């Protein structure tokens, strides 16, 4: 038995989404038979392009994407360029590994009510919810779509900044979610998990020094 709505929208309170954007995202999902989740390009409050998708990386690439130095050194290897992502059925949108949780649409016809209830993991908060969702959909043979000819506005970090004022506190929360994701979704063994923990400890020290001592922000 399926839910009555054809689509469900999940969004943060700090986003601005037009009716035209919503209709365009729904259209992309409708045209993609195995498309389960979709969103649009993200822009900030100044209209500048912002982060709009992730690849579902291996654990080691994911770790490199965490370090402030390694992220810059290996930038070219850490994310597939938008134009190289597979095209969706509408000929415009792209298929991605994961979408930001600030705004996305779910096509309920892809799921039973039971599947839909289990779609979101309650053991993580603020970080890695999106990649966990991406992994679950991948296991189900379903796709996430990024509509590249529509956009919405997101005032990034407004919600989280109210609860976590120190960058190092946000980083700790990120690392906790990362390790949960590695263990339960990437199925890391004890030895690999220990290496990941050691790497993240170095990253946290780096963040504390750069933000606490040098007062840097990014």
Language-model segments: residues:
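Short aromatic/hydrophobic "clamp" motif used to bind/position activated sugar donors
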Residues: 8
């Amino acid at each position: 038995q399926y839910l009555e709505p054809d689509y469900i929208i999940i969004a943060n309170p700090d986003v601005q989404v037009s009716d035209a954007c919503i209709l365009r995202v729904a259209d992309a999902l409708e045209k993609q038979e195995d498309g389960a989740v979709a969103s649009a390009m993200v822009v900030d409050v100044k209209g500048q392009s912002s982060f709009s998708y992730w690849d579902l990386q291996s654990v080691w690439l994911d770790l490199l994407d965490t370090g402030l130095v390694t992220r810059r050194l290996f930038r070219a290897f850490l994310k597939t360029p938008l134009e190289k992502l597979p095209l969706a059925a509408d000929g415009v949108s792209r298929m991605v590994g994961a979408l930001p949780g600030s705004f996305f649409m779910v096509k309920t016809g892809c799921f039973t009510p039971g599947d839909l209830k289990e779609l979101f993991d309650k053991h993580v908060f603020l970080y890695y919810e999106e990649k966990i969702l991406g992994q679950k959909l991948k296991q189900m043979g379903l796709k996430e779509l990024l509509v590249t000819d529509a956009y919405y506005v997101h005032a990034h970090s407004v919600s989280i900044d109210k609860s976590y004022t120190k960058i190092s506190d946000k980083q700790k929360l990120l690392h906790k979610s990362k390790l949960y994701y590695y263990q339960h979704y990437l199925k890391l063994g004890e030895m690999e998990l220990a290496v990941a923990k050691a790497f993240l400890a170095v990253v946290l020290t780096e963040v504390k020094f750069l933000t606490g001592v040098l007062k840097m922000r990014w």
